[in-house]
Amino acid sequence: MAGDKQNLQDAFLNHVRKGKVPVTIFLINGVKLQGVITWFDNFCVLLRRDGQSQLVYKHAISTIMPGQPISLYEGED
């Protein structure tokens, strides 16, 4: 059912969060942040590194790169 499908952004963020995949986040001002995503909602992402948490607003994010290859494709069309 189309209503049950998750959007790509949420699927990606949930995958790296559940797998505790290290990510690099580039902000629109060029700042690079690294850590593990522990939580997210429609407006922000919580990034954890070395026991410290950073709340990053999504409107400030340019790119999120996982530290390892990931596959979101589950074989369904």
Swiss-Prot record:
Pfam families: Hfq. Signal peptide: none annotated. InterPro entries: Hfq (IPR005001), LSM_dom_sf (IPR010920), Sm (IPR047575). Belongs to the Hfq family. The keyword RNA-binding applies. GO terms for cellular component: cytosol. The gene is hfq. SUPFAM superfamilies: Sm-like ribonucleoproteins. The keyword RNA-binding applies. PROSITE patterns: SM. It comes from the Bacteria. The lineage of its organism: Bacteria, Pseudomonadati, Pseudomonadota, Alphaproteobacteria, Rhodobacterales. One of its GO terms (molecular function) is RNA binding. Homohexamer. One of its GO terms (biological process) is regulation of translation, ncRNA-mediated. RNA chaperone that binds small regulatory RNA (sRNAs) and mRNAs to facilitate mRNA translational regulation in response to envelope stress, environmental stress and changes in metabolite concentrations. Also binds with high specificity to tRNAs. NCBIfam families: Hfq, PRK00395.1. This is RNA-binding protein Hfq. Keywords: RNA-binding, Stress response. Residues 10-70 form the Sm domain.
